[in-house]
């Protein structure tokens, strides 16, 4: 696990981009990180890339310009009536540092002014307490998604 000093934290950058502005190399790096986590680490032999990505806003977390985390925001009407957050991924060397919370805080700040009806997500069940700490409530589940236990959660704004 990496230890981030205050100086290191100042070199962290959050960057929002729509799929349409990624270069091929940048998109490849993002997919490589997601695939490492969701396919290799979790031993989940299912399709990582889907038809939603081209419609999404993607948040990148960079440390010294190296991609170490990402998530995507899916607009309302694509997966759910509300917008949704998914594919939250942190490089294994940077876990346990609160960076997942930083990504989620940024995502909620991005979503609330654009889609004030709230945010829905399909969370891996073991992360329920984490998402509850961000104000999400379980609305369905547990159920299997790609053979991994998940729960559907919702956060209303206001």
Predicted regions span which residues?
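Conserved acetyl-CoA-binding loop-helix of GNAT-fold acetyltransferases
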Residues: 90, 96-109
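Conserved GNAT acetyl-CoA-binding A-motif
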Residues: 104, 111-124
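Conserved beta-strand in the GNAT
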Residues: 60, 66-76, 81-89
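A short beta-turn/loop motif at secondary-structure boundaries
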Residues: 49-54, 77, 144-145
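A conserved beta-turn-beta hairpin within the catalytic core of GNAT-like acetyltransferases
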Residues: 75-85, 95, 115-117, 146-150
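Conserved catalytic-core motifs of GNAT/GCN5-like acyltransferases
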Residues: 122, 132, 137-152
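N-terminal, polar/charged subdomain of small-to-medium soluble alpha/beta proteins
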Residues: 4-10, 70, 87, 91, ...
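Short amphipathic alpha-helix that is part of the acyltransferase structural core
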Residues: 2-67
């Amino acid at each position: 696990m990496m230890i981030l000093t205050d100086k290191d934290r100042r070199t962290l950058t959050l960057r929002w981009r729509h799929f349409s502005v990624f270069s091929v190399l940048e998109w490849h790096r993002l997919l490589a990180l997601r695939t490492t986590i969701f396919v290799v680490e979790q031993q989940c032999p299912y399709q990582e890339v889907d038809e939603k990505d081209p419609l999404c806003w993607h948040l990148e977390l960079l440390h010294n310009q190296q991609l170490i985390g990402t998530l995507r925001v899916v607009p309302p009407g694509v997966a759910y009536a509300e917008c949704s957050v998914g594919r939250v991924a942190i490089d294994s060397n940077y876990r346990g540092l609160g960076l997942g919370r930083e990504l989620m805080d940024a995502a909620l700040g991005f979503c609330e002014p654009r889609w004030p009806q709230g945010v829905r997500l399909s969370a891996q069940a073991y992360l329920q307490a984490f998402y509850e700490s961000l104000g999400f409530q379980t609305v369905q589940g547990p159920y299997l998604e790609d053979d991994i236990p998940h729960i559907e959660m919702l956060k209303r704004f206001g």
